[in-house]
Amino acid sequence: MIAAPRPSFTVPIPGRAPLVLGPRTLVMGVINVTPDSFSDGGKALDPAQARDIAQAMAAAGADIIDVGAESTRPGATPVGAAEEIARVEPAIKAIAAAVSVPISIDTYKASVAAAALDLGACIVNDISAFEYDGELGPLVAKHGVPAILMHTRGRPDDMYAHAEYRDVVSEVIADLSSAIERARLSGVQRRLLIIDPGLGFAKKARQSLEVLANLERFGQLDLPLLIGPSRKSFMAAATGPLGPEERDWGTAAAVTSAILQGAHIVRVHNVEKMIHVVRVADALRSAGPHS
């Protein structure tokens, strides 16, 4: 099995062990404390539910727990910062008391990130790559925490109006390069950055598949690569219509492809199932000439 080269990175986290990226693929488990997320909305609204899910993910092998309190699915209704904080604070407090793995806050709002970081989150995952809220980059710089910069265009309620590309892979790479520069200008150290091509965000199904099929090209950005294909609707271009949980088989295929192309982190909903996929894909990498 010939796998793409995967460079190693060490991403520091204040007050705890760094993320060591490269020797094996890290698994990020998703917990949405929302009533309307496309895959698991409503399943973790209660802090005790969020805690139990996080404990199960950690026990299954999750390396990071990603907590979000606003659905960013296409067409989702925006949530104000006060409501987002009210949702995320009790969840992060409960999760941080129950698991030792790093917690990531999935938000594009500086005020939400600040509240989450104060309660134990130590990574910021921003779908807008510091574009929606100009205060988020400086906040990340101040705290010295890792940041995940995801690619999108427009806002969740109009992103598909921006899904026009002549060369989707080249343009996503160029946009991420601009995001990296935006982070630099905000004072964020390059060694703290992780990039995410944003499958399903401002991309039609075939465009997401094209990005997924060309992940090796993102190596030119020389940063750790996170991929989030989990249960996304772009898979319907290959499978036909399926419910979110029925997309786990497609997710497994996407995760395997991403790892063989050099992805460092995969973001998934079903950690218990996907951890086995990740381990087999890593075994294929280690058996190949480019491991």
Question: Can you annotate each of these PLM segments?
Answer:
Residues 199:
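Active-site metal-binding loops of divalent metal-dependent hydrolases
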Residues 2-7, 13, 22, 39-53, ...:
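Active-site-adjacent loop and "lid" segments of alpha/beta metabolic enzymes
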Residues 35:
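Catalytic-pocket segment enriched in acidic/His residues
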Residues 52-68, 261:
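Catalytic domains of carbohydrate-active enzymes, especially glycoside hydrolases
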